[in-house]
Amino acid sequence: MSQPPSGGAAPAATSASAAAAATEARMHPEGCSRKQQRAQSPARPRDNSLRQTAGATRSPLGVGPKLNSVRQQQLQQQQQQGNKITGRSTSGTGSRGLGGGAEKAVPSIPKGAVPGAVQPAPGAEGSPAAILASVSFRRSGQPEEAPREIESGPSKVGEPPPLGGVGGGGEGGGAGGGPGDREGGAPQPPPPRGWRGKGVRATQRGSSVAEGVSPSPPTAATSKTPGPGSRNSGSGSTGSGSGGGGSYWKEGCLQSELIQFHLKKERAAAAAAAAQMHTKNGGGGSRSSPVAGAPAICEPLVVPSSSPMAAAAEGPQQSAEGNGSGGAMQAAAPPSSQPHSQQLQEQEDMQEEMEKLREENETLKNEIDELRTEMDEMRDTFFEEDACQLQEMRHELERANKNCRILQYRLRKAERKRLRYAQTGEIDGELLRSLEQDLKVAKDVSVRLHHELENVEEKRTTTEDENEKLRQQLIEVEIAKQALQNELEKMKELSLKRRGSKDLPKSEKKAQQTPTEDDNEDLKCQLQFVKEEAALMRKKMAKIDKEKDRFEHELQKYRSFYGDLDSPLPKGEAGGPPSTREAELKLRLRLVEEEANILGRKIVELEVENRGLKAELDDLRGEDFNGSSNPLMREQSESLSELRQHLQLVEDETELLRRNVADLEEQNKRITAELNKYKYKSSGHDSSRHHDNAKTEALQEELKAARLQINELSGKVMQLQYENRVLMSNMQRYDLASHLGIRGSPRDSDAESDAGKKESDDDSRPPHRKREGPIGGESDSEEVRNIRSLTPTRSFYPTPGPWPKSFSDRQQMKDIRSEAERLGKTIDRLIADTSTIITEARIYVANGDLFGLMDEEDDGSRIREHELLYRINAQMKAFRKELQTFIDRLEVPKSADDRGAEEPISVSQMFQPIILLILILVLFSSLSYTTIFKLVFLFTLFFVL
C-alpha cells in the first residue's frame, strides 16, 4: 500500500511543469508570446465576436442553480462519458494513476458555455466565469450527492480514481488531499509568489482543461480507498481551480499586464486566507471513516475554487503535500459555520472585484479601440496630405524645369548672336529690318493720330461756335416771343376797353392779375438769359486766357532764341527803330530766294544729266560687242570704278540739295513764326509803331510766296524722281520686248508681275501725309501724256535682223541682264520708300518745331533715326549704281542697220527733254518768269555744249 518515493516524483514534476506553463501563458498571452505573433494588427478592424461570446460566457456568473435544461443535459452527458471512461481505465501504480488523466483526457464543453460559443484552445486558461459557475454548481450539488457517495463507497474500494477526479485532469495534476490530510498535521507554509511548479506546464500541454473545469460528482468516491488513488481524491476541485485560471483577453500586452497585476493581488489574498484556514483546521486532522472524510474533502475544495489565483497557488502546494505524505489519507475535521460564512463573504467580494475588473477591462478595450481608430485616421490623413503635397511639388518641379529649358534656349541663342557679332562685327540684318519696320509703322501711326487729333479739335471748335451761335439766336427768339406776347396782351386790353363790356368784376380781376404774372415770367426769362450770357462770356474769357498763355509761351520761346525785342541789339547792330529789323528780315528773305533759285538750277542740271545718262545708256545698248567675253569683262572692271565714283558724286549732291531744301523750309517756318509773334507783339506797343504793319504784312506775303516756291520745288523733285522710275521701268520692258522679238519670254510676264506687285504694294501701304504737290504726272494734261509716250525707247527700233553666230552667248547675256533689271527694280522701290520716309520725317519735324510740340529727347532720337535712314538710303543707291553699270556693260550688241536707223531718233531725242521741261514749267506757272527763263537757258546751253 505504500507508495515508493519515485511514485510522487512524477506527479510533482508534472505539476511543476503545468504551473510553469500556466505562468508562461500568463506572462506571454496570445498576441504577445514568443512563439506566436499577434493575430490582429492595430490597423485591422477587430472581430467583436470574441467579446460577444465572452459577454455571453460571463452572463451566468453565480447562477448555477438557474441553468436551463439544455445545459443540465450537457452536464449529464459529460458525467456519463466520465463514468464510462473511469470504468474502462485499468488500475495501476500511483504514478500511472496520476498521469492517466493527463494522457487520456477528453476535452469537454465547459459548464457555463453556450453550445455555439467560441471555446478556448487547448493549453489556454479557462475563463473566470466558467470557474465561478463550476464552484457554485458544486456548492449547490454537494449536499445532494454526499449520501450517494457514501453508499457507493464500499463497492468502489480498490478502483482507480475516475477521470474527473484525477489530478492530471486539471492543471494541478499532482494536487493532493485537503489541507488536513498530512501525516504530521502541521500546515506547510504557502509557496512564494514567484514559485512556479512543473505540473502546470505538463497539464497545460495535456489539453485537458475542459475536464478539470467541468466538475463530476462521483469524484469524491475515490477518496475512500487508501493507496495511490487516495492522494488525488481532492484533485477534482483543485484541478478545476487551477485549470480555470484567469483567462487573458486577446487584445494586447497592456491589458495582459493589468490583468496579471490584479490576479497576483487576488492570488496573494487567497494564499493568506488558505494559510489561515490551515492554521485553524490543521490540528483536528486525523484518520477517520470514509463517511466523515467526505465533507472534509468537499469543504476545502470550495475555497480555492473561488479564486483562480488561489487555485493556481495551492495546486503545486497540495501536489507536493500529497507526494510527501506517503499515500496516507488523513480526514479533516468538519469546519464550523463561522469559517464557512467568511468563505462565502470572501467569495462574494472576489466576485465583485472580478466584475469591477471586467468593467475596467471593457473600458480599457473601448479606449484602446478609440485610440486605434484615431491613429488610423491620423495615419490616413497624413498619407493623403503627404500625397497631395508630393503631387504639387512634382507639378512645380515640372514647371520650373520647363522655364529653365526655355531660359537656357534663349541664353544659348543670345550667346550665339553675341559670338557671331564679336567675330564678324556685323549687325543682325533681321533685327535691323524689324526695327525699321517698327519705326515706319510707329511713324505712320503717329502721323495719322496727329491728323485725327487735329481734325477732332477742329470739329470741336466748330461745334462749340455753332452752339454759341444757336444759344444767342435762341435768346433773341425768346426775347422777341416775349415782346410779341406783351403786345398781344396790350391789344387784348385795348379791345376789351373798346367793347365796354359790363360784366367787369371777374374779368377785370383776372385781367389785373395776369399782367403781374406775365411780368414775373418775363423777368424770370430775362434773368435766365442773362445767366446764360454770363456763362458764355466766362467760356470766352477762359478761351482767351488759354490763347494768351499759349502766346506767352511762344513769346518766351522766341525770346530764348532771338532775345528780347526791347533789349539792346548786339554790337554789330546798333539799336535803332524797327526798320533795322525789317531790313534784316528782307535780307534773309533775299538769301532764301537766292538759295531756292540755286537749288532749282541744280535740280534742272541733275535732271539734264540724268537724261544724258539715259541717252548714253541707249547708245551703249545699240553698240555691238567686238571680241570675246573675257575682254568684255576686263572693260567692265575698268569702267566700273569710274562710273561708281561719278554716280556717287551725283547722289551726294542730290542728298545735300535735299538737306538744304529741308533746312530752308525749317528756316522759313521759323521766320514765319517770328513774324507772327512780332505781329502779335506789335499790337501791345505804342502807337508810333502802327505804321510798320503794312511792311510786316508785305514781308509776310513774300515769305509765304518763298515757302510756296520751296514746296513746289520739293514737289517737282519728287515728281521727277517718280517719272524717272516710271521711265526706267518702261524702257526695260520695251527693251525686253524688242530683244526677244516674236518669241515670248517668261521675263515679260515676270516684269509685268513685278509691276503688278508694285501697284499692290503701293495699295497695301499705310496712308502717309498729304503730299504738297502732284507726283508722277497725275495732274498732267492729255497733250503732255502723249508727248511722254513719244519718248525714245527701244520699242521704236526696227525688228532685229538675222541672229549672229554667237546665239548662245547673246541669250545668256539677255538672261543675266533681265535678272539684274529685276533686282534693280526692287532696289529702286526700297530707295523710293526710304526717301518718302525721310521727307515725311522732315515735314513732321518742321511742324513740331513750329508748334513747339517736340522735346529735346525726341529731337535727338529723330536725328539719329534720320542719320540711320540716310546711311541706308546711300548704301542702297550705291548698290543700285553698281548694278546699273553692270547692266550697261551687259548690253546686247546690234547690227549696223540698227545703228543707222537709230541715229535720226537720237537727234530728236536731244530736244524732247527741253520740250518736256518747257511744258512742265508752263503747267506749273507759279514760278516767276525770270526763273523760267533761267531754266530754259540752262537747258539749251547744256545741250548745245
Swiss-Prot record:
Q: Which residues carry this modification: Phosphoserine?
A: 567, 779
Q: Which residues form the signal peptide?
A: 1-25
Where is the region Disordered? 1-250, 265-293, 307-366, 494-522, 741-811
* Localization of this protein: Membrane
Q: Where is the composition biased (Low complexity)?
A: 1-23, 72-93, 110-126, 219-235, 328-345
In terms of InterPro entries, this protein maps to: MTCL1-3, SOGA_CC
Q: Does the keyword Transmembrane apply?
A: yes
Topology in the lipid bilayer: Single-pass membrane protein
A Pfam family (short name) is: SOGA
Q: Per the annotation, which location comes first and is thus the protein's main one?
A: membrane
Name-wise, this protein is Microtubule cross-linking factor 3
* Species: Mus musculus
